[in-house]
UniProtKB/Swiss-Prot annotation:
SMART domains registered for this protein in UniProt: RPOLD (SM00662)
Protein name from the UniProt record: DNA-directed RNA polymerase subunit alpha
Gene Ontology MF annotations: DNA binding; DNA-directed RNA polymerase activity; protein dimerization activity
GO biological process, any: DNA-templated transcription
Entry superkingdom: Bacteria
Xref: HAMAP family: RNApol_bact_RpoA (MF_00059)
Amino acid sequence: MYKNWRDLIRPKQLQFEKESLSDTYGKFFAEPFERGFATTLGNSLRRILLSSLQGSAITSVRIKGVLHEFSAIQGVTEDVTDIILNLKGVRLKLHSVVQATIRVVHTGEGVVKAGDFVVGHNVEIMNPEHHIATCGKDAHFEMDMTVKMGKGYVSADKNRDEKAPVGTIPIDSIFSPIKKVNFTISNARVGQMTDYDKLTLEIWTDGSVKPDDALAYSAKIMKEQLSIFINFDEEAEPQAPEESQDEIDKINENLYRTVEELELSVRSANCLKNAGIKLIGELVSKTEAEMLKTQNFGRKSLNEIKDILSDMGLTFGMKLDSFPEPDMLRRLRGEQNEEE
């Protein structure tokens, strides 16, 4: 029965675009997948990212001198309805707590922004420039807000607390820290076969969670939800046969071969020479994005090299912590001397 999943192609590793990775955006790649698996996983991860990750949001507000949301505040341009709408756009992060109270007090002319909120060490404002209200000369604006942890969207009715002080107005809350998720499917090559899938995921967040962490959390959620469907003891499963030492040595030796042995086109070979890349190990440690930044190195050269590396069981973006190994270099040099 183990062949049901052991014979399937599995992605080698998760890669990401280093140049664009930030606290609010990440672009991730995984390949190869059996045909159809990338679509299944991409769609599932997207739904979980958008709906199931925990975040923080303002759930209620109390403004001094205001009893309901249809009131106006003396000296303030926006009415209470507009202020509540602005509060829904405030992005926050709670540290070590699930609920907190924040407040703001402003007297006189000026603009109130999210960065003006008085918060404790357990609350962090992710968009401090977000507009809240515009005050005139005779304004005295005083407001207390409750911040809670949650997921997805929660309506004002569900945020209503019967024990809250008079004048407390519950508001709709959008807890999700994920702004947007896109995924695309393209072809991936395994040896001479090109009918496999490559999954590309783009994740935008509000900064309260990093894109790579958000992806990891969503994968963990999916794994936990699927675990009940496994009706056998996974620990009793015999280990899959490991690669033979000969196969490992062959891959290792390929890393120490020169790029000249790849028999590349003149243009590609010159690009690698100008970039100072001599060994295949140096080449595969580069990401595709890094290679495309090499002078005169284009997509055509990239695809040419990818095809050749794939036939050798190698790919761009490999993590070679122990490369180069002095013993391996001496060994290969010795073999070359014997041949001469």
